């Protein structure tokens, strides 16, 4: 090793040979410290770039330690000692100077002197005469240069705020306090600058944060902040000005994107027999099928293995089928259920669609960081682009974001805060959240941009339910409540009524009393009616298209169901109460009027089919251990099922009519889930629907004929085949009759003018014969004979 160093730097070797070991260890000579790193850089970098090494073979070192490989293009390994000194002692500038000096010495040095020093012929490490050093500093000193100061350091922590009020010296201090209060919540402000002109501020300011991340946070959250009616802040990074100034003045025409034809995504609505579709997951989730609902037997449309890893979900209008995968969500649609879109979200577990089917919300507990929120992501379904990410609190309940009926707004509730966002910007409405101390729950109206929320009691302040109009944030109704334990918000499907179920503990009593506060939303000043019940409430449900609601109350085995009607005069009338019901859930038909009272799971699947027009029980049945009940979108059929997810045996789904008549029993191995495909809202007006109901008798004959055909034992294909055969026979018969009539004259000539086509043409040739049958009559007496 020592010989190799002497060959490369003979002067350094001579200087190190004279001092004693203590001096060499304590304070090396300057020449040695500079020369050795320089030689390292030249040998390791320049020779490698120069290509082939010295001409002719090279002799190995005499002592055997510092062997140099004579292979062309190869460089000797640097000594470990010098490597340590290069990394730990020599600065970048000294290393470059030493490399230059070593290169010049190698090029102009005396090769004979090197041979004498080494005592043998050693390889030459000098560069060729035409060698050009093209190794950049970034390649040689990347680890050192990465820490050098950058020009942008400090600048990318500066933001520019426009639309700031222009004030004089007397109000400048007050303005600074307001600005500091708004922008200091994003991070520590280290410097500010308020440009002035003619004794007044110019309307824009500069703020510097301690960190670029704080500046970026301020831009994201403060841009568009409304200070007052005349001033709305526009916030940008200072570095953005350079970016916008370097934009080319020449406009580049964007490439035209080819239109991707997805086909008719709502083809199933044009089905001739107006049948509905539903999805089925079975074999413990390994297989997924889509069926047409047919009275006789379900008709399979599509079946795939491992289509989803957990479960599936239809979009609100039935356009898309969502499947779950470890890496994200996929949407399918069209006649062949091709993939329409996919969204990458690792470990996704829950999803939610906006009512307009424009946006998709996904949740994953795996991906979330403080700087880049990924727990909840909102996607644009049409483009597949991520719109915004959000953090998720551990105590939140799904759906965390609740959508308005038209998809224009969505909101979330956190501690003492209600945040309302607007689309498509995904930003806060008016750039700020609502501060509502103690807010417990909220819900959107299905019929308008009205939000309802409730706040519990706080010392002497009563609990209250508030109705707020958006986007104006006007409170249209406030209802104060006392002695409140809990509240639940129940909207009627059209938004005509809001029921607030209030559990109270009246003073002087130990039990819990339930009040149903009914808000009549379509009337002036939103009047409220109250129904009080002292029994335990099991379930509550509004009629979807009507003004009735049902309540399950009591305790097993004395459970009752009560049906109420909200009249136009404001009175709430009890229509009917059924005692001794085995039910724990209420399922209204989507069209109203009919309801199924089901005792699911622990109540062994007891079913009661009720017509609320006259409050009669049409049928009582049972589907043992039923876990789910699903109405079809039209309200004609209802499915009860036993899911493998809740019960491991007798997994199947049964199809019933709305009257409670059982049509099918479909058993599937490890059946898991059945979901009807939703239908979009009808395009018909209420007047058109009324006219159709009036003319329904005209179509009844057609419907009855179709019903008879569908109830026939022969399949549809067999009936069609028979109809085709009958039509072919009629055509053949007509053709044969025409040929028969054409040949009549020929027959008359052959038979001497006698028309044998008629039976009475020749009466003389008739022969009459009488045939007698002998009949035996036997009388058998019935009963006892005395």
UniProtKB/Swiss-Prot annotation:
The modification N6-acetyllysine is found at residues 181, 260, 336. SUPFAM superfamilies: RNA-binding domain, RBD, Tricorn protease domain 2. The keyword Transferase does not apply. The modification N-acetylmethionine is found at residue 1. Residues 142-246 are annotated as: Sufficient for interaction with EIF3J. It comes from the Eukaryota. Signal peptide: none annotated. Residues 20-33, 50-73, 81-104 have a biased composition (Low complexity). PROSITE patterns: RRM (PS50102). Gene3D superfamilies: 3.30.70.330, YVTN repeat-like/Quinoprotein amine dehydrogenase. Residues 1-130 are annotated as: Disordered. Keywords: Acetylation, Cytoplasm, Initiation factor, Phosphoprotein, Protein biosynthesis, Repeat, RNA-binding, WD repeat. The modification Phosphoserine is found at residues 104, 124, 126, 136, 211. Residues 157-240 form the RRM domain. One of its GO terms (molecular function) is translation initiation factor activity. WD repeats lie at residues 304-342, 344-389, 393-431, 532-573, 621-666. One of its GO terms (biological process) is regulation of translational initiation. RNA-binding component of the eukaryotic translation initiation factor 3 (eIF-3) complex, which is required for several steps in the initiation of protein synthesis. The eIF-3 complex associates with the 40S ribosome and facilitates the recruitment of eIF-1, eIF-1A, eIF-2:GTP:methionyl-tRNAi and eIF-5 to form the 43S pre-initiation complex (43S PIC). The eIF-3 complex stimulates mRNA recruitment to the 43S PIC and scanning of the mRNA for AUG recognition. Component of the eukaryotic translation initiation factor 3 (eIF-3) complex, which is composed of 13 subunits: EIF3A, EIF3B, EIF3C, EIF3D, EIF3E, EIF3F, EIF3G, EIF3H, EIF3I, EIF3J, EIF3K, EIF3L and EIF3M. The eIF-3 complex appears to include 3 stable modules: module A is composed of EIF3A, EIF3B, EIF3G and EIF3I; module B is composed of EIF3F, EIF3H, and EIF3M; and module C is composed of EIF3C, EIF3D, EIF3E, EIF3K and EIF3L. EIF3C of module C binds EIF3B of module A and EIF3H of module B, thereby linking the three modules. EIF3J is a labile subunit that binds to the eIF-3 complex via EIF3B. Belongs to the eIF-3 subunit B family. This is Eukaryotic translation initiation factor 3 subunit B.
């Amino acid at each position: 090793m020592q010989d190799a160093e002497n060959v490369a730097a003979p002067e350094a070797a001579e200087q190190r040979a004279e001092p004693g070991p203590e001096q060499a260890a304590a304070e090396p000579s300057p020449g040695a410290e500079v020369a050795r790193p320089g030689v390292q850089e030249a040998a390791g970098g320049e020779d490698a770039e120069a290509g082939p090494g010295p001409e002719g073979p090279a002799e190995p070192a005499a002592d055997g330690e510092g062997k140099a490989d004579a292979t062309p293009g190869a460089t000797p390994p640097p000594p470990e000692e010098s490597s340590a000194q290069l990394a730990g002692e020599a600065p970048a500038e000294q290393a470059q100077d030493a490399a230059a000096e070593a290169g010049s010495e190698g090029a102009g040095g005396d090769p004979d002197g090197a041979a004498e020093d080494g005592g043998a012929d050693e390889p030459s490490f000098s560069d060729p005469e035409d060698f050009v050093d093209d190794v950049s500093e970034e390649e040689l000193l990347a680890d050192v240069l990465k820490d050098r100061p950058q020009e942008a350091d400090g600048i990318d922590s500066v933001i520019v705020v426009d639309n700031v009020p222009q004030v004089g010296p007397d109000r400048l201090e007050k303005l600074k306090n307001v600005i500091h209060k708004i922008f200091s919540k994003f991070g520590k402000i280290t410097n500010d600058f308020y440009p002035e002109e003619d004794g007044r501020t110019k309307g824009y300011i500069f703020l510097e944060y301690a960190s670029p991340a704080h500046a970026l946070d301020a831009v994201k959250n403060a841009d568009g902040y409304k200070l007052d009616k005349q001033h709305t802040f526009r916030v940008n990074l200072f570095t953005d000005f350079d970016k916008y100034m370097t934009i080319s003045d020449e406009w580049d025409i964007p490439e035209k994107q080819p239109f991707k034809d997805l086909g008719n995504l709502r083809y199933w609505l044009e089905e001739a027999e107006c049948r509905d579709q539903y999805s089925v997951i079975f074999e413990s989730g390994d297989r997924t099928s889509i069926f047409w609902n047919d009275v006789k037997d379900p008709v399979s449309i599509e079946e795939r293995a491992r289509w989803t890893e957990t479960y599936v979900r239809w979009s609100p209008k039935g356009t898309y089928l969502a499947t779950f995968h470890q890496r994200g969500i996929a949407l399918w649609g069209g006649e062949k259920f091709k993939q329409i879109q996919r969204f990458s979200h690792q470990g996704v577990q829950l999803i939610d669609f906006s009512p307009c089917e424009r946006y998709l919300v996904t949740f994953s507990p795996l991906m979330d960081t403080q700087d880049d929120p990924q727990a909840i992501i909102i996607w644009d379904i049409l483009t597949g682009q991520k719109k915004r990410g959000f953090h998720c609190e551990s105590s939140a309940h799904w759906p965390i974001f609740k959508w308005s009926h038209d998809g224009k707004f969505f909101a979330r509730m956190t501690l003492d805060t209600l945040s309302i966002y607007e689309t498509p910007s995904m930003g806060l409405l008016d750039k700020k959240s609502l501060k509502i101390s103690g807010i417990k729950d909220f819900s959107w109206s299905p019929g308008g941009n009205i939000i309802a929320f409730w706040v519990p009691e706080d010392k002497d302040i009563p609990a209250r339910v508030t109705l707020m109009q958006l986007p104006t944030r006007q409170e249209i109704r406030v209802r104060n409540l006392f002695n409140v334990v809990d509240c639940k918000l129940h909207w009627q499907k059209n938004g005509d009524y809001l029921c607030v179920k209030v559990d109270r503990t009246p003073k002087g009593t130990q039990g819990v009393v339930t009040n149903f506060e009914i808000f009549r939303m379509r009337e002036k000043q939103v009047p409220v009616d109250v129904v009080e019940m002292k029994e335990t409430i099991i379930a509550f449900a509004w009629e979807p298209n009507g003004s009735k609601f049902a309540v399950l109350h009591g305790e097993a085995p004395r459970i009752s169901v009560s049906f109420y009607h909200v009249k136009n005069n404001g009175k709430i009338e009890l229509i009917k109460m059924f005692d001794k019901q085995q039910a724990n859930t209420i399922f209204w038909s989507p069209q109203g009027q009919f309801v199924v009272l089901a005792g699911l799971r622990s109540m062994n699947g007891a079913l009661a089919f009720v017509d609320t027009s006259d409050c009669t029980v049409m049928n009582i049945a049972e589907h043992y251990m039923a876990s789910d009940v699903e109405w079809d979108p039209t309200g004609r059929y209802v499915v009860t099922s036993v899911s493998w997810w809740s019960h491991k045996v007798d997994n199947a789904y049964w199809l019933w009519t709305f009257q409670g008549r059982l049509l099918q029993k479909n058993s599937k191995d490890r059946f898991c889930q059945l979901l009807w495909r939703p239908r979009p809202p009808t395009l018909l007006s209420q007047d058109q629907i009324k006219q159709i109901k009036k003319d329904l008798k005209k179509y009844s004959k057609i419907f009855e004929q179709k019903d008879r055909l569908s109830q026939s034992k022969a399949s549809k294909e067999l009936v069609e085949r028979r109809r085709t055969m009958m039509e072919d026979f009629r055509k053949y018969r007509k053709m044969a009759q025409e040929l028969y009539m054409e040949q009549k004259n020929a027959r008359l000539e052959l038979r001497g003018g006698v028309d044998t086509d008629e039976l009475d043409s020749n009466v003389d040739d008739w022969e009459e014969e009488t045939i007698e049958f002998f009949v035996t009559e036997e009388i058998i007496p019935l009963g006892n004979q005395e």
